Amino acid sequence: MKLKHFLIKRINIWENAELIESNTIEFDKTFRVYFENLQEAREINMILPIFSKMYIDIILESLIENDATLTLITNKRILDLINENDADNAFDSLIKEGRIQAILADYDLEMFFTSCDNFSSLFLFFDKMLFDDSEMLLIKDEENIKNAKNMFNHLERLAKSQFPLKH
């Protein structure tokens, strides 16, 4: 099942989400809001369809500072880029400590979805392959955070059934 189809069936969890938009004055607003929320998370679940050193750095920083855990669904290309750019071996060390569980998906990841204990967020792509970080849907209410976690758990089972990553 494609991720888009799965998401459409569960779109109601996003109906009360706040739309965070960057603009010419606050060009980094979505990144800043994402980072502020991620800094408070202790349990992070993520579908990561892109490689961005900036995002990887804030994810690793949050994991280290909060003694947090990460379940990461990504593809081989992104995982290879993360490992190639892991100069201080933080990513590899966190995997060895059991604080990062990486799952490789063999299908297109068409969204950047984060489900944490304190928030959930969704970034989409513009025109199929262009990642749009100027807009983000943000969930902060407890009930929809729980629903987003359930959605992530389903997507995790789907990814594991297709191509689990073993370390």
For each predicted feature, which ranges?
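PLD/PLD-like phosphodiesterase catalytic module centered on the HKD motif
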Residues: 1-11, 55-167
